[in-house]
Amino acid sequence: MLIFPPEWVPTAPYLALPSLAAVLRQNGIETVLKDINVEMFDHFFTSGFLLFVKSKIQARLRALRQREQGERLSPEDAELKQMLSDYQLIDLDHHITKVARAKKIMRGPEFYEVEKAEWALNAFREVMEYISVCYFPASINFYPVESNLNVYRPWVSEDLLKVPYDKQVNVYADICRQLVLRSIKKEKPDVVGISIGTPVQLMAGITFATLIKEAYPDIHVTVGGNVITRLKDEFAKLPHFFGKVFDSMITYEGEHALVWLVEALSGKRKLSEVSNLIYKDEEGNMHVNDTYQENVTELPPPDFDGMPWEKYFSPEKLVPYLGTRGCYWGKCTFCDHGAGYIDQFRAKHAEQ
């Protein structure tokens, strides 16, 4: 199973999962794709999730009122209590109806009517404010993708270890329990790969990996993607992450590395032979394997089978394609695009 965690623009698939799936399936490896990013946003705008949020707001408010009986609340908690009380008064059924209509607008021809599209986006934003109150002080957004858990820092390892267990602020933990773990229970994968391509995905990706390992310790969880590649040297110095948060890391490009990892886990090769892999052995020793760069002219086209096309917030099917990797120039001081690749610029032939 391959998982793409939040958050990314929910208008089209990110190319990582289809690119990996194409090579895995080419090698006879059954692969399930889960774009949890778009599934999360679709889930946010459902009556089931919004009623769940309502119950969480009520629970937080009750807890503050009970505390107030025995002690004086701090100014911050008193302000939170008032905010939660105010949001108890909103007409939730009205907003549930609005976002259901908004989803139809965003996914159909009415999207091209500017006033209707703006109305739909505002309907989403109103509901996101309600969700953010539930997870306060987190700020959860639909678009632009700028959500922030605020009390946790994504570049601090201690925070990454703590955040999966925060049931008050971490919305991604609830999404993992409601969407990810249920899918794993249904599909029963032997290996789960989580592609973390952007910094804003780090909290969600680490949360998913941790809770998957906790619920299914026998599943091999591997993480990869551009951000993981950038942090490879730091994670290699943190052996306590391996086995608890995830089992291995795949750096740089992962198409064939993931195939070789699956083969190694099934006894067909040694883990030491899997290029781009970082892992910890049974004795607790860390291993950073050699690197491998894909020949893009030999890669199959991306395989989108299994992507939830009906859930993307777009009136048309937007199919991404990548004809090149790396950068032919690579000297711009303001750009770090090349950090996700080993070195050279590569391009497919025009007929491909």
Describe the predicted segments one by one.
Residues E76-V99, K104, V114-A120:
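Extended, charge-enriched "interface" segments that sit outside catalytic cores
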Residues T297-Q352:
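Radical SAM [4Fe-4S] cluster-binding motif and immediate context
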Residues I3-P6, P189-S195, V245, L318, ...:
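Glycine- and acidic
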Residues E7-K54, R62, G70-E71, Y87, ...:
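Glycine-rich beta-alpha loop elements in corrinoid/cobalamin-binding modules
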Residues M1-L2, I278, V288, P320-L322, ...:
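Structured core elements
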Residues Q58-S85:
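Aromatic- and Gly/Pro-rich amphipathic surface segment
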Residues D290-T297:
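A short, sequence-level motif marking secondary-structure junctions
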Residues G108:
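A substrate-binding/cap region within the structured catalytic cores of diverse enzymes
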